[in-house]
Each structure stands twice: as structure tokens, then as C-alpha cells.
């Protein structure tokens, strides 16, 4: 089983679009898109990871 991951190297960003492409974080929270998810990853100092694509 391949690990799912997202490249967050260009984050954090000051503003995210309203694009809806949900991702489920390891905190069992659904993030609206990659930008919102990656900003949360940066804020968590890398402790937050991607559980899977789609809603939790």
C-alpha cells in the first residue's frame, strides 16, 4: 500500500482559494483543499499528516 502524501513545500500561503477538493487529515478533520491542509500542516510543525484524499 503506497503512502499518500501532499507536497507542502511552498506553504504556508496567506490566502487559500475556495476550491473544494477535500482531504482528510490525521486529526480526522476534513480540509477543503490542499492549501488549507498544507497551512494546517505547517502550523502543526509537521505532526499533521494526510490520512486520505476525500472527506473523512
Swiss-Prot record:
<dbReference type="InterPro" id="IPR001239">
    <property type="entry name" value="Prot_inh_Kazal-m"/>
</dbReference>
<feature type="disulfide bond">
    <location>
        <begin position="24"/>
        <end position="56"/>
    </location>
</feature>
<feature type="domain" description="Kazal-like">
    <location>
        <begin position="6"/>
        <end position="56"/>
    </location>
</feature>
<keyword id="KW-0325">Glycoprotein</keyword>
<dbReference type="GO" id="GO:0005615">
    <property type="term" value="C:extracellular space"/>
</dbReference>
<keyword id="KW-0722">Serine protease inhibitor</keyword>
<feature type="glycosylation site" description="N-linked (GlcNAc...) asparagine">
    <location>
        <position position="45"/>
    </location>
</feature>
<dbReference type="InterPro" id="IPR002350">
    <property type="entry name" value="Kazal_dom"/>
</dbReference>
<dbReference type="InterPro" id="IPR036058">
    <property type="entry name" value="Kazal_dom_sf"/>
</dbReference>
<dbReference type="InterPro" id="IPR051597">
    <property type="entry name" value="Bifunctional_prot_inhibitor"/>
</dbReference>
<dbReference type="Pfam" id="PF00050">
    <property type="entry name" value="Kazal_1"/>
</dbReference>
<protein>
    <recommendedName>
        <fullName>Ovomucoid</fullName>
    </recommendedName>
</protein>
<keyword id="KW-0964">Secreted</keyword>
<dbReference type="GO" id="GO:0004867">
    <property type="term" value="F:serine-type endopeptidase inhibitor activity"/>
</dbReference>
<keyword id="KW-0677">Repeat</keyword>
<feature type="disulfide bond">
    <location>
        <begin position="8"/>
        <end position="38"/>
    </location>
</feature>
<feature type="site" description="Reactive bond 3">
    <location>
        <begin position="18"/>
        <end position="19"/>
    </location>
</feature>
<keyword id="KW-1015">Disulfide bond</keyword>
<feature type="disulfide bond">
    <location>
        <begin position="16"/>
        <end position="35"/>
    </location>
</feature>
<keyword id="KW-0646">Protease inhibitor</keyword>
Amino acid at each position: 500500500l503506497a503512502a499518500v502524501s501532499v507536497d507542502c513545500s511552498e506553504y504556508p500561503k496567506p490566502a487559500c482559494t475556495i476550491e473544494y477538493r477535500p482531504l482528510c487529515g490525521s486529526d480526522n478533520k476534513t480540509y477543503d483543499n490542499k492549501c488549507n491542509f498544507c497551512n494546517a500542516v505547517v502550523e502543526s510543525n509537521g505532526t499533521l499528516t494526510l490520512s486520505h484524499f476525500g472527506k473523512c
